[in-house]
């Protein structure tokens, strides 16, 4: 049975990301999600390479470990709902991903290149040129990725897939995607202390003017954005 609250939260996050053009914060990757079973030329990948694909409204990153294996930090709501590894190891759908972002649950897991890419085109080591940082040796990059496998808390701003790969590749956790998302949101929300006030005002507007009020969406979105931006 579907949970209406999780369904609504998933839809809200998706709309927020669309509004902020989050997908445009990194390079546009053509062909995203056009065919989950498409073949990939994995012989061109080297252990320790950073792989980059377009996934839902995010640019998703992973570290190639060799032998058709990719380590990547992946939000997944199922991690909060079950300990059944057979279920959680299945390919993470876009809805599972979005709900995992909302609930801040994730793991650093290993998938095949095909499952990681989810039908999108793959860019290799594109961050090297974007960030203009000196990368570590590829074997060290892969070793760092392997050492971090397992459950991890998720934060859109402080611990996402880009933070994971930049730590492995360059030795420091940075995420231009997250920084640009934060810059967009803070134009509207300047102080986290406004969360309680906005929630109270939003509740009052809903009570007195009804759910159809034009004030309802901001009343819900502002506290929700603050929740997602918290560590």
From Swiss-Prot:
- PROSITE patterns, alphabetized: LRAT (PS51934)
Residues annotated as domain LRAT: 50-177
Q: Could you say what a knockout of this gene produces?
A: Knockout mice are viable. Knockout mice at one month of age show loss of nearly all cone photoreceptors in the central and ventral retina. Surviving cone cells show severe degeneration, the dorsal retinal also exhibits a significant reduction in cone photoreceptors. At one month of age rod photoreceptors show shorter outer segments. Nearly all cone photoreceptors are lost by six months of age. Remaining cone cells show disrupted structures with the majority showing abnormal cell bodies or lack of an outer segment.
Q: Which GO terms describe its biological process?
A: 1,2-diacyl-sn-glycero-3-phosphocholine metabolic process; cellular response to leukemia inhibitory factor; lipid storage; positive regulation of lipid transport; response to bacterium; response to retinoic acid; response to vitamin A; retinoid metabolic process
Query: Which tissues is this chain's protein expressed in?
Result: Hepatic stellate cells and endothelial cells (at protein level).
Cellular component terms per the entry's GO annotation: endoplasmic reticulum; endoplasmic reticulum membrane; multivesicular body; perinuclear region of cytoplasm; rough endoplasmic reticulum
A Pfam family matched in the record: LRAT
What the entry lists under InterPro entries is as follows: LRAT (IPR042288), LRAT_dom (IPR007053)
The active site is formed by 60, 72, 161
Q: Which UniProt keywords apply?
A: Acyltransferase, Cytoplasm, Endoplasmic reticulum, Endosome, Lipid metabolism, Membrane, Sensory transduction, Transferase, Transmembrane, Transmembrane helix, Vision
* Location relative to the cell: Endoplasmic reticulum membrane; Rough endoplasmic reticulum; Endosome, Multivesicular body; Cytoplasm, Perinuclear region
What do we know about what induces or represses this protein's expression?
LRAT activity is up-regulated by dietary vitamin A. Under conditions of vitamin A depletion, LRAT expression in the liver is induced by retinoic acid.
- Segments on the Lumenal side according to the record's topology features: 216-231
Q: How does it sit in the membrane?
A: Single-pass membrane protein
Q: In which pathway does it act?
A: Cofactor metabolism; retinol metabolism
What regulates the activity here?
Inhibited by all-trans-retinyl alpha-bromoacetate and N-boc-L-biocytinyl-11-aminoundecane chloro-methyl ketone (BACMK).
User: Any idea of its EC number?
Assistant: 2.3.1.135
- Any transmembrane segments, and where? 195-215
Molecular function GO terms recorded: O-acyltransferase activity; O-palmitoyltransferase activity; phosphatidylcholine-retinol O-acyltransferase activity; retinoic acid binding; retinol binding
Catalytic activity, reaction form: all-trans-retinol--[retinol-binding protein] + a 1,2-diacyl-sn-glycero-3-phosphocholine = apo--[retinol-binding protein] + an all-trans-retinyl ester + a 2-acyl-sn-glycero-3-phosphocholine; 1,2-diheptanoyl-sn-glycero-3-phosphocholine + all-trans-retinol--[retinol-binding protein] = all-trans-retinyl heptanoate + 2-heptanoyl-sn-glycero-3-phosphocholine + apo--[retinol-binding protein]; 1,2-dioctanoyl-sn-glycero-3-phosphocholine + all-trans-retinol--[retinol-binding protein] = 2-octanoyl-sn-glycero-3-phosphocholine + all-trans-retinyl octanoate + apo--[retinol-binding protein]; all-trans-retinol--[retinol-binding protein] + 1,2-dihexadecanoyl-sn-glycero-3-phosphocholine = apo--[retinol-binding protein] + all-trans-retinyl hexadecanoate + 2-hexadecanoyl-sn-glycero-3-phosphocholine
Query: Which protein family is named in the record?
Result: Belongs to the H-rev107 family.
Q: What does this protein do?
A: Transfers the acyl group from the sn-1 position of phosphatidylcholine to all-trans retinol, producing all-trans retinyl esters. Retinyl esters are storage forms of vitamin A. LRAT plays a critical role in vision. It provides the all-trans retinyl ester substrates for the isomerohydrolase which processes the esters into 11-cis-retinol in the retinal pigment epithelium; due to a membrane-associated alcohol dehydrogenase, 11 cis-retinol is oxidized and converted into 11-cis-retinaldehyde which is the chromophore for rhodopsin and the cone photopigments.
| Record PANTHER family | LECITHIN RETINOL ACYLTRANSFERASE
Protein name, as recorded: Lecithin retinol acyltransferase
Organism annotation = Mus musculus
